[in-house]
Amino acid sequence: MDGEAVRFCTDNQCVSLHPQEVDSVAMAPAAPKIPRLVQATPAFMAVTLVFSLVTLFVVVQQQTRPVPKPVQAVILGDNITGHLPFEPNNHHHFGREAEMRELIQTFKGHMENSSAWVVEIQMLKCRVDNVNSQLQVLGDHLGNTNADIQMVKGVLKDATTLSLQTQMLRSSLEGTNAEIQRLKEDLEKADALTFQTLNFLKSSLENTSIELHVLSRGLENANSEIQMLNASLETANTQAQLANSSLKNANAEIYVLRGHLDSVNDLRTQNQVLRNSLEGANAEIQGLKENLQNTNALNSQTQAFIKSSFDNTSAEIQFLRGHLERAGDEIHVLKRDLKMVTAQTQKANGRLDQTDTQIQVFKSEMENVNTLNAQIQVLNGHMKNASREIQTLKQGMKNASALTSQTQMLDSNLQKASAEIQRLRGDLENTKALTMEIQQEQSRLKTLHVVITSQEQLQRTQSQLLQMVLQGWKFNGGSLYYFSSVKKSWHEAEQFCVSQGAHLASVASKEEQAFLVEFTSKVYYWIGLTDRGTEGSWRWTDGTPFNAAQNKAPGSKGSCPLRKYIIVNSGMGACSFIDTPPCPWILSN
């Protein structure tokens, strides 16, 4: 209450009611004041109750008060004559007659106005019905808005889920980048190791070429010696034909020459073995070069692909970040719009309650009005109130139209958000596909790493074999043999072989025996046949059992040199313990 004006405030608008001839003034939106609204509502109800009681009292007084006699006379006239109850020649009564006529005209005008007011009241009722229907439509729109709000909440939950998935993808991409960096470092290490292996192979090849050059010179010298021996043989044959007396000397010389020929044959065999080993080494080196070229090409392709994939991944991540930021902004705008819609909905509900209260009061007052004067007074007051309410309803309709436009804007924003979510889902699928490709590339890189490791192991094995071949090792049947030039006792030779991770040679087949005989000539070599610890039960030192059925018993105790063993197994004698000077040995690996 402020003087003669009454103010009603909602969350963001205030309406003031003034006395007659003063219109309602719509004040500027004020800040929400819930305590003032709580205080104004009881005051408004009290004022409405007092106004209704006063109106009821006036109506009762109008019904109980008798009509003045002059007015009855004016209205009804004389019951007998039907004329006015005054004399025409009386000037005083003539003036009263004019006044009464004027009063009658005024009353008729009021009656006509009352009929017009009845029409306006009917129009107001129609408008009230229209307002009720519009309020029902507004309630339906509010229900649809609530459904849209629930749908927006679901979309926001989906957006939250997408943001979590995007964070997971970021963490997986960071792990993938770290794995790619580690693989790059491994590739650099592999390239460095390959370069070192290449240098080692080049140096080994140079050494091999030098040794082959030396061997070729030795072969040339051997060929010249063979030619000289052929000439000597021709001379010896001529001398044998000419003189039988020199036959013994010639036979002796031939025997010596045959020994030289055996040496030459051994040299030829060694030369052939070296040539085969060299050809194999050249083929392996060529294969290694091709493998290195393929590995370098594959490394370059892999690096280019990984770089392009990383660039594409970074661009897509930036793109996703931008979209997520825009989605966050749109979600913030939607939240703000939802808050505005909620506030406007509450305001509309308050106005609807006020409108219902006003309509109920209007109906009760319309039922209680019985006289024309009371109807005029009440209608004047209610016309003003109705105009105020109409203005309020118009403002509510404007707000409803604004709410409808905001609802449409929310629908469009929801459609945009749905399209954005669909596009984000597509981007997520693309990111998943990219992750699968990265995993495939990682598996390929792991396979390449395994291949490179196996190639490095093969290169190391080949390098070791090449070094062993260059050091004088012989290859036969998947095993390597080393014919020593240092003489030791059998026990010392065995201990040396065990310290090198090998053992004295064992004869497991006729082919192996033939191979060993080919390189031993007339020199004794220790082999790994022994009965130490098991008197009379012979065995090989590498654990291979000695087959007594296929081989004849070696004889008495002791370890047997190779030539003795061969003689024993040919049935030419027995292998006994030999107290001779130390012999060289055959190392088998």
Swiss-Prot record:
Glycosylated position list: 79, 113, 207, 230, 244, 312, 385, 399
PROSITE patterns in the record: C_TYPE_LECTIN_2 (PS50041)
Species of the source: Homo sapiens (Human)
GO molecular function: carbohydrate binding; pattern recognition receptor activity
InterPro entries: C-type_lectin-like, C-type_lectin-like/link_sf, C-type_lectin/snaclec_domain, CD209-like_CTLD, CTDL_fold
Ranges for domain C-type lectin: 476-589
Record-annotated membrane-spanning stretches: 40-60
Protein name: C-type lectin domain family 4 member F
Keywords in alphabetical order: Endocytosis, Glycoprotein, Lectin, Membrane, Receptor, Signal-anchor, Transmembrane, Transmembrane helix
